[in-house]
């Protein structure tokens, strides 16, 4: 996976949503195109299609009928298991980009993805993990 011209990467960017949060796709797509690139393809994973247009670099994939929160992870897992790509970037519609993407940091991350001894499960690119209190 490489960063191409216009800050486009050749791996899927998948953004999860649900019917109750479709309106968040408006600010999400605007901020994504502002701070990443309007040339970067993005796939929205949801249930009902939005009733408004998305930017041309965004596509919508329905996960079927929204059956409730208890089935959400199952629906996402089914989609991901059918994905042919080795790598993907996954996020949610309520995690907005709020400043330009640091592509030098992204290049460093991509190097880690390519090392044989690095088994990556998750990297949090936002502040929520470090700023929110956790109780377990």
Where does each model-flagged region fall?
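Short, charged/polar "capping" segments at the starts of alpha-helices
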Residues: 21-25, 48-54, 130-131
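Acidic metal-phosphate-binding loop of nucleotide-sugar-dependent transferases
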Residues: 95-97
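N-proximal low-complexity "stem/linker" segments adjacent to membrane-targeting elements
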Residues: 1-27
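Active-site-proximal specificity loops/subdomain of glycosyltransferases
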Residues: 44-88, 101
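Catalytic metal- and UDP-sugar-binding loop of GT-A-like glycosyltransferases, i.e.
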Residues: 91
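Conserved donor-nucleotide/metal-binding helix-loop-beta segment in metal-dependent transferases, i.e.
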Residues: 99-131
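A conserved mid-domain beta-alpha-beta active-site/ligand-binding segment of alpha/beta enzyme cores
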Residues: 136
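Short, acidic, metal-binding catalytic loop of nucleotide-sugar glycosyltransferases
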Residues: 29-40
